[in-house]
């Protein structure tokens, strides 16, 4: 069975100072779950060269598929490409293909002065090397997913672009990591109970300890819903263990006065929707 581990780097001072709410990591977490990828870490860091380089080098050593989002714009604090190049000991150069796509899509030379044009082409100045490959996954966009060593994938921080490009990249991603060959698929069940977390903690620990012996991928979680008068138990694991997972569901229902609910209903509860 193919096992792919992943990590996500959210880059931007605007996230750390509360100016922007990060939604890309949530999207990526769901994306990984849907494609049988084991997301192991999410790092949120600022526009700091040392921090970016250190984080990239650490994650690349430990995981298979690392994405970054943010910091590839035209301003002084957009340093992601430069830092990624440094992380892999590569030069950072103007990419002619990206530059030509910019010209074709928006004709910047006809509408920008020299200083603005230089800043604009900063967005096409990216890592260069034999281990670098740019994937132009959307025909109407000039920005690529920049890949280094089939490990690091650099995406824009704008949520709409991030989501669209990642979705479009899926067929290529499956080929790179052989995700269609004996794929790892995850399933998750939810059980609602009016018992408190203190009342269910002992039973959940017993279930988790027993489940780990079956598969380390099985995770039992408890999620309180403040002011709603109930909690939700999550049972997550691989599809190959579905029969065992369903036995856990029945155990939780019977032992913790629970009822099975859909993921859609659980999402409503999590978002405090009535």
From Swiss-Prot:
Gene Ontology CC terms: cytoplasm; nucleus
Modified residues (Phosphoserine): 263
Stretches that traverse the bilayer: none
UniProt feature coiled coil, ranges: none
GO biological process, one term: flavin-containing compound metabolic process
Other notes: Present with 3890 molecules/cell in log phase SD medium.
Protein's recorded name: Uncharacterized protein YMR178W
């Amino acid at each position: 069975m193919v096992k792919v581990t992943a990590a996500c780097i959210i880059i931007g001072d605007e996230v750390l100072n509360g100016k922007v709410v990060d939604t890309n990591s949530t999207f990526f977490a769901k994306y990984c779950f849907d494609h049988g990828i084991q997301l192991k870490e999410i790092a949120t860091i600022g526009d700091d060269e040392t921090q970016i380089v250190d984080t990239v080098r650490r994650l690349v050593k430990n995981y298979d598929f690392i994405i970054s989002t943010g910091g590839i714009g035209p301003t002084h604090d957009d340093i992601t490409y430069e830092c990624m190049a440094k992380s892999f000991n590569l030069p950072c150069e103007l990419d002619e293909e990206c530059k030509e796509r910019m010209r074709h899509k928006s004709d910047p030379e006809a509408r920008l002065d020299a200083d603005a044009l230089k800043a604009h082409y900063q967005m096409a100045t990216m890592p260069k090397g034999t281990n670098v490959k740019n994937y132009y996954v959307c025909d109407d966009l000039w920005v690529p997913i920049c890949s280094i060593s089939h490990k690091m994938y650099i995406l824009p921080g704008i949520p709409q672009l991030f989501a669209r490009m990642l979705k479009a990249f899926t067929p290529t991603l499956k080929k790179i990591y052989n995700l269609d060959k004996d794929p790892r698929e995850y399933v998750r069940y939810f059980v609602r109970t009016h018992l408190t977390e203190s009342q269910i903690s002992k039973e959940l620990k017993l279930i988790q300890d027993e489940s780990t012996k079956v598969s380390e991928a099985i995770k039992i979680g408890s999620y309180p819903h403040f002011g709603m008068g109930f909690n939700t138990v999550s049972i997550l694991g691989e599809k190959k263990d579905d029969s065992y997972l369903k036995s856990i569901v029945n155990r939780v229902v019977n032992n913790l006065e629970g009822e099975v609910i859909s993921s859609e209903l659980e999402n409503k509860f999590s978002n405090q929707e009535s």
